[in-house]
Amino acid sequence: MSVMKALQRRKTIREIGNKKLPSQLLSNLLWAAWGVNRENGPFDTPGRTAASASNSQEIDLYVAMQDGVYLYNASHHKLDPVLAGDFRSLAIGTSQMDFVANAPVQLIYVVDIHKLTHTTGFQEPGLQNHEVQKSYYYVDTGLIAGNVYLFAASQGLASWFHNCDKTGLAAKLELRAEQRVLFGQTIGYPSKN
């Protein structure tokens, strides 16, 4: 499908079924979201499918599924196990969104401030300022989420970008002080046409 067609089909779909995604489809989704698309990116680091401030690659992409939570390792294009068990409900954040609690994939966007402030190469002006940091990591998250939306549209999948239980997820994932949970994104097959 062309990019223009994917853009035409891009939309938020909140009615998401519980049918599991095939492994290759999940693999392609994660690569499209935040994968390595070139070895020689800016500042002698691999480039990604979404831009980031000073190529800091400060967003960590966690994947919550029925069997556990994983961290997407873009360099090796694999999922590293983080936590066993079903924690998808934390990724949606509220009982008012229970209708997607059993969707097969819940992405969890986590910023690592250390990566943002300790990049090699060019440093964006003001990166030590917390408000400037927030503006960059929110934009960078949006770029990744946009890739997810376009991939979902191209594959006939449903996707919904939303808030999540930030405190609950941070505790379960045992995040470091310089890491922050930002948002969730639910992906699966549409439950309605």
Residue ranges and their predicted role:
Residues 173-193:
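A glycine-rich helix N-cap at a beta->alpha junction
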Residues 2, 6-14, 113-126:
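Residues forming anionic-ligand binding surfaces in small-molecule and nucleic-acid pockets
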Residues 102-104, 157, 178-180:
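Short coil/turn connectors at secondary-structure junctions
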Residues 1-105, 173:
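N-terminal amphipathic, basic helical "cap/leader" segment at the start of enzyme domains
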